């Protein structure tokens, strides 16, 4: 079978930088699926992505589909022919659909009967007749939230398309994609190299683009150049560059020919909190800040130019001129904001809505203040500090700095609180109230901050659920999933003695009569338990282990964590499988006898069979032994003790008829099984385990 290299390049206007990688990877994934579904053999599939192009290169692609055998089973012989042996309408219709007559059909015999059977070898089509359609199908499946039209065309894509190249070896594949006819024309860099040129063979890509067009189409290559050169540049400055992956990815998606340069700003700006300067450099300008070995910000930054200039100093000076006014603004805002105390902003919070049905930011502040104090008391943290931090929690939203540089909220609250002489734990709590902000983010670093962070999130959860605006599908405008997971992470990872049902009740109470959803507490608790399921699955715990624990509806997150770990360990014991099966059996028996009134306890005088006497004795001993373990949340030790029941339970079921005809004996045995099940349920519903 002859093979060729296949190339598709879609030349566009500037693609969304934050989506470039996902677009390219998705394009390659969907096109590979098209090839596999069409039974086209191929080698490695490589994707390329630059600001103005998406491309795929496929090695060793077969020039035609592989031949395949088509097999179709028809009606059973009994239904295929009538009593006179003539084909029925069902048989004739089936044969006609396959392009044959009934006489031409084969017979398929199995131990279940005999059927009409059709078998044919289908020759594969030439791939040059299929590729354009397959590319179009793959492009149609890209994750594009908003499509656009351009000119007078009816086609839609993420950005206007100017060139399309489809090459199989040196053969141009004819086809129209997104309204553009396939051609050999490829466009180069806007300002360097050749503006456009022709490509003769798919194997020339991407080298020809590098040599003639001055474009590095390989995304990972551009990224590695930026990382290498930026690290080297930072070392020459005696520092370390902040090369956060998200910003490096964005910059990689913005340039076709990366040239790393260094620039500086005036040292006086270092008097402004570093977070504000960094926000300007990273968020607005896409610059990489540089820190010294101790982590202090240096008056330098690294940026990536999209052009190789004969006078790089001119580019450096231009970028320094661009960033200076932004840094000067930050300096001005910082000085202006400190002319009044942070607390002086409280009245202005009354003028800003939190949510139209839930009051102002001042209302939210008052609720956070009260709830933080409530939580701090439960945690054993300083109540006065927690309420003080709650009172000041939203004041920085009214400052000039945060109004202009929104991502500095919390951080600026901390700096202004320190300037005002507030307690350090209070100041830090203002910054950390929003943590954790994303998966893997740091948790609040002190008990006061934890209390405020939990209060801030629980207030939002209770309020939004309280007016019936639950997250639906992918829509979660108030980031309730993130808030719920944040609360759970803080409580679990800091092992705090908090109950989410109790927290929700208090948070809802503080809203007074503003909430309309009467089920707000149960709704929030169920939502948070659902977050537990998703989180612990991501951590690698099995779904049935999680469900076994959730069946007990544990509302103390730290307790949930202890139970999941205990059940996970229990499953490693050799007794686990037998006891899980026994629990299923017990659960089924009790469910069928739900209307039976059980005894308050097992009656020793009614016990007859030696096996039930033994089980009752073991249960009695274990009940006394397990009580302190349950009280201290030593669930793993408790389950190890319960594992010792395996043989006794097995003997009981092997030798004893639970549903005895004597009612007194029957009820006593059901009571004993109920006590057995209740011991396991103190940890989890083991019967759920698969």
UniProtKB/Swiss-Prot annotation:
Its EC number is 6.1.1.14. Its main location: cytoplasm. It catalyses: tRNA(Gly) + glycine + ATP = glycyl-tRNA(Gly) + AMP + diphosphate. Keywords: Aminoacyl-tRNA synthetase, ATP-binding, Cytoplasm, Ligase, Nucleotide-binding, Protein biosynthesis. InterPro entries: DALR_anticod-bd, Gly-tRNA-synth_bsu, Gly-tRNA-synth_heterodimer. The keyword 4Fe-4S does not apply. It is found in: Cytoplasm. GO terms for cellular component: cytosol. GO terms for molecular function: arginine-tRNA ligase activity; ATP binding; glycine-tRNA ligase activity. It comes from the Bacteria. GO terms for biological process: arginyl-tRNA aminoacylation; glycyl-tRNA aminoacylation. Pfam families: DALR_1, tRNA_synt_2f. Tetramer of two alpha and two beta subunits. Belongs to the class-II aminoacyl-tRNA synthetase family. PANTHER family: GLYCINE--TRNA LIGASE, CHLOROPLASTIC_MITOCHONDRIAL 2, GLYCYL-TRNA SYNTHETASE. This is Glycine--tRNA ligase beta subunit. The gene is glyS.
């Amino acid at each position: 079978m002859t093979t060729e290299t296949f190339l598709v390049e879609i030349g566009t206007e500037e693609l969304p930088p934050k989506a470039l990688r996902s677009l390219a990877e998705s394009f390659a994934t969907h096109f590979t699926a098209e090839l596999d579904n069409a039974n086209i053999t191929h080698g490695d599939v490589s994707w390329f992505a630059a600001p103005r192009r998406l491309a795929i290169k496929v090695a060793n692609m077969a020039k035609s589909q592989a031949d395949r055998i088509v097999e179709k089973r028809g009606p059973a012989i009994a239904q295929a022919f009538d009593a006179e042996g003539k084909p029925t309408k069902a048989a004739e219709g089936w044969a006609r659909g396959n392009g044959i007559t009934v006489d031409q059909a084969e017979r398929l015999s199995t131990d279940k009967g005999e059927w009409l059977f059709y078998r044919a070898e289908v020759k594969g089509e030439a791939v040059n007749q299929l590729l354009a359609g397959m590319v179009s199908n793959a492009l149609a499946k890209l994750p594009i939230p908003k499509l656009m039209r351009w000119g007078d065309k009816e086609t839609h894509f993420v950005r206007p398309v100017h060139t399309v190249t489809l090459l199989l070896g040196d053969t141009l594949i004819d086809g129209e994609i997104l309204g553009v006819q396939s051609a050999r024309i490829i466009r180069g860099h806007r300002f360097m190299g050749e503006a456009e040129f022709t490509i003769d063979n798919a194997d020339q890509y991407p080298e020809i683009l590098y040599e003639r067009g001055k474009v590095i189409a390989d995304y990972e290559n551009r990224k590695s150049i930026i990382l290498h050169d930026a690290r080297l540049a930072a070392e020459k400055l005696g520092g370390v560059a902040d090369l956060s992956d998200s910003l490096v990815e964005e910059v990689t998606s913005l340039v076709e020919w990366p040239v790393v340069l260094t620039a500086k700003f005036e040292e006086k700006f270092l008097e402004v909190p570093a977070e504000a300067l960094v926000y300007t450099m990273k968020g607005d300008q896409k610059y990489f800040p540089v820190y010294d070995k101790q982590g202090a910000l240096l008056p330098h930054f690294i940026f990536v130019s999209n052009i190789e200039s004969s006078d790089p100093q001119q580019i450096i000076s231009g970028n320094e001129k661009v960033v200076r006014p932004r840094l000067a603004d930050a300096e001005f805002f910082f000085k202006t904001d400190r002319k009044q105390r942070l607390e002086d902003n409280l009245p202005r919070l009354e003028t800003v809505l939190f949510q139209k049905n839930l009051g102002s930011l001042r209302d939210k502040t008052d609720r956070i203040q009260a709830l933080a104090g409530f939580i701090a008391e439960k945690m054993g943290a300083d109540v006065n500090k927690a309420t003080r931090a709650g009172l000041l929690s939203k004041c920085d939203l009214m400052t000039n700095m945060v109004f202009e540089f929104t991502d500095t909220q919390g951080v600026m609250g901390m700096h202004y609180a320190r300037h005002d002489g507030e307690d350090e734990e209070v100041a830090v709590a203002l910054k950390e109230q929003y943590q954790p902000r994303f998966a893997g983010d740091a948790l609040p670093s002190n008990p006061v901050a934890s209390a405020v962070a939990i209060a801030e999130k629980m207030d939002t959860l209770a309020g939004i659920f309280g007016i019936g605006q639950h997250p639906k599908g992918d829509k979660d405008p108030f980031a309730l999933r993130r808030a719920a997971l944040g609360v759970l992470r803080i409580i679990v990872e800091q092992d705090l003695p908090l109950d989410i049902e109790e927290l929700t009740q208090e948070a809802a109470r503080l809203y007074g009569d503003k909430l309309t959803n009467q089920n707000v507490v149960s709704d929030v608790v169920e939502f948070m338990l659902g977050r537990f399921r998703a989180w612990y699955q991501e951590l690698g715990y099995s779904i049935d282990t999680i469900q076994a624990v959730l069946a007990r509806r544990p509302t103390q997150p730290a307790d949930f964590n202890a139970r999941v770990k205990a059940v996970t360990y229990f499953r490693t014991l050799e007794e686990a499988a037998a006891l899980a099966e026994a629990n299923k059996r017990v659960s089924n028996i009790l469910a069928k006898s739900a209307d039976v009134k059980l005894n308050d306890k097992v009656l020793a005088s009614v016990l007859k069979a030696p096996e039930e006497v033994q089980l009752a004795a073991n249960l009695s001993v274990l009940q006394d032994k397990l009580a302190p373990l349950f009280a201290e949340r030593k669930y793993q030790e408790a389950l190890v003790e319960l594992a010792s029941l395996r043989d006794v339970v097995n003997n009981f079921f092997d030798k004893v008829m639970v549903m005895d005809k004597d009612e007194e004996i029957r009820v006593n045995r059901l009571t004993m099984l109920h006590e057995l099940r209740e011991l396991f349920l103190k940890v989890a519903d083991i019967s759920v385990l698969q």
